[in-house]
Structure formats: C-alpha cells, structure tokens
Amino acid sequence: MRGAFYVTTALLITNSIRTAAEANPPGRQPMSHHDGVVPGKSSPRRFLQGSHEPHDKFAVSAANEERMPEPSAKITASLSEEALDTVRKAAHFTFDLNAPPEETPTGMVEAYQVLRQKDPRTVTASHPKRTAEALTSLDEALGYANPKYSAGGQSKKLRTSVSFKATEVRNSISRDRMTPTPRTLSDDDVQNVHKLYMEHLERNLAVFAPTVGGRRE
C-alpha cells in the first residue's frame, strides 16, 4: 500500500510539471499586468498590420519629397529684380551708359547730379583743372548756373529759373547741394550730356590707368 501511494504521488507531480511547461513554453516572457491587459489575453498590436518596425512620424518618404513644390519662377524673378534695384540705388546709377542716349534721359540727369556733387579733389586729385572744366561743360549743357562764392568762402545761394530748349530747370544751388527738378529733355540735350559725361569718364581712366615699367598701357 505504501509503495502504491509513492508511485501515485510521483505520477501526479510529473503530470503537474508537464502541464506547467506546456502552459509557459521556453523563451516566452511573463506578461506585465501594468499594461492594462487581462491575464490570459494577448496584448493589442501597437503597429499597423504588416509593419514590423516602429513608425517614425517625422520621417518623409521619397514620394513626398518628390511632390514638394519648387519655388515659383515669378517669385524668384521678383526677388532678383528687387536685389538688382537695390544694387543700382547703392551705386547711384539706374541706367546703362552703353545704352543709346535717347533711352536714358532720366539717367543722364542723375549721372550729372552724382558727378556734380562729388568733390573734384576726390575724383582726379592730380588734374583738378580737368575735372572743373568737365563739370563746367556739364553745367552749360544742362543750362545750370555756376555757384558763386563770397570772399569769405561762404556759399551764396542762388535761385534761378532757366529755360533751355524743351527743358525748364528750377534749382537751388549752394556749395554742397543742388536740387533740380527737370522736365523732359530733348534728344539733343540728352546726347550732349551723354557725350560730355563719357568724355569725363575717359579722362578719369587716363589719369588712373595702370602702368607697367613707368609706361601706360
């Protein structure tokens, strides 16, 4: 009797171990009860079906990159034109000296103004007389009166109203400032100013031309 009891107990223990092994196969981690999962039920899938890797919500697919719009050509052209206009204003010139003179009447007046306001000593230091002559010629071409100075060196302001062909100029001239308000220039006026201004530039180039061995190229 005692031997049969031992055999029955051993069989029960073996059966219990086998059942436990089948319920928890090797390699399976115990499930945490902190995930809100009821024991005995599988946890819900966290990823879409067919996805085996975590999803990066910040990733951009190649297809989306190809669909990204290119900068508008109109916007690019507008920004380019604004940049060029800023450069022109910074250089004090809004015209092309190589263009036909009849196409740049406003530009010629602006060129004259920039040139007239410059100190001759900073333009052609070694030839101030040439610079003065060029400025005088430009004054005559546009009909501007030359500024007068008193013996004490103080500038004497003049207010003149000059009619020059198809141009009426009202200007307030002082030693450091001239503010003309010209109307439309005739073709002859523009060509004269253009010619004189180009001659003035040629004089400057001749003065500052680089030399090689003491000889101008």
Curated annotation (Swiss-Prot):
> Which family, according to UniProt?
Belongs to the RxLR effector family.
Cite the domain annotation text.
Answer: The RxLR-dEER motif acts to carry the protein into the host cell cytoplasm through binding to cell surface phosphatidylinositol-3-phosphate.
Q: Which gene encodes it?
A: RXLR147
Q: Where in the cell is it found?
A: Secreted; Host nucleus; Host cytoplasm
Which stretches are annotated as coiled coil? none
- Under which name does UniProt file this protein? Secreted RxLR effector protein 147
**Any one annotated GO CC term:** extracellular region
What role does it play?
A: Secreted effector that completely suppresses the host cell death induced by cell death-inducing proteins.
| Keywords, ordered alphabetically | Host cytoplasm, Host nucleus, Secreted, Signal, Virulence
Q: Where is this motif: RxLR-dEER?
A: 46-67
Top-level taxonomic group: Eukaryota
For the region Disordered, give the residue spans. Answer: 22-52
Per the record, the major location class is: secreted
> What residue stretch is flagged as signal peptide?
1-23
